């Protein structure tokens, strides 16, 4: 979970570091076509991408703390908070007072979350990344017909549901929406404190899944929570909801989905990543 330009990969000093889950990692496109890769190329800033599949706030906190203790330096950390972070953070992970993350119920699952992301993810989990990327690419060669509604897996639908559910406790979630969000905010508060101690700037970004475009509102609870968190903390709060909602309102949900997302998947395609990069570059000067 550490990507950068080849000539920079052994360096421990970066202008910008990005962290998030598979959306930030860039699954399944190449680094150069991801919003982080485009940002690095266009701005010339030394940039590290720390994102990897299934990361969430507890891991953002643990991983950044680990890297700083190992002597890595960033001027500015940008966290891309994903819609699925709520489910992953509350259902999968526990964190102790030493900021060590473990997987909940790992004995029952018989997978120990890929030996917990290769023993707490120093800089790897490469094999799972390659396998997942190959499988993802092979599943997305066909283009979505303009009148064809996307079909998502039940797990994807479940992870998206919390932002537009009328219920505080959703079946399949370990915690209620209010309690779960408070736990995520608490982790991010701790991350902010660690960054502040080293004079590292923090910015935060939010963006919609296709589910939010179809079922949620532009001023989603996901937006409200992190906009409120960012007051007096973040250098920038980067809200991508208006871009995609405006596009949808000027065309249609299906047209917007087809243009920016992969078929039957909530991840952004190359066009979507270009949109993320464009706004990012406009804000981060």
Residues covered by each model-derived region:
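Active-site flanking residues adjacent to catalytic metal/cofactor-binding acidic residues
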Residues: 20, 79-81, 238
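Histidine-centered active-site loop/cap adjacent to the catalytic His
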Residues: 260-285
